[in-house]
C-alpha cells in the first residue's frame, strides 16, 4: 500500500475521529447497530466520503431507518466543526447490513 501524504494523514485522522464519536453515540442510541466504517478516496475528499452504520439484522435496520436523516445531520455538523463542508449530507451516511469486507 502506498504511503499517505501528510495531508492524507490529516484527512484520515479527521474522519476516524468523527466516525469514532458517531459510532459511540449510535451504539448507545440505536439498538442493533454493530459498527461504523467508512470509505473514501483521498483525491476526491470530502465528496467521496461514505460513512456506513452496519446493523446486525434486517429488523434492526428497518427500525433505525426513520433516524437516518438525524444521523446524516450529525455527521454534517461534526464535519463542519472540523472545518469540512459536506455539500449534500444525504450522500455521505447510509445504514446497511454489509460490513467493510462485503
Model-based region annotation:
Residues 1-21:
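N-terminal presequence-like segments and adjacent domain-start helices
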Residues 2, 6, 29, 45:
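Extracytoplasmic glycan-interaction modules
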Residues 14-21, 70, 74-78:
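Long, highly charged amphipathic alpha-helices
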Residues 16-17, 28, 58, 68:
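N-terminal targeting leaders
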Residues 23-35, 82-88:
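Short secondary-structure junctions
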Residues 30-56, 94:
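Short edge beta-strands and adjacent turn/loop segments
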Residues 50-69:
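A short interface-forming secondary-structure element
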Residues 76-102:
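A short amphipathic beta-strand at an alpha->beta junction
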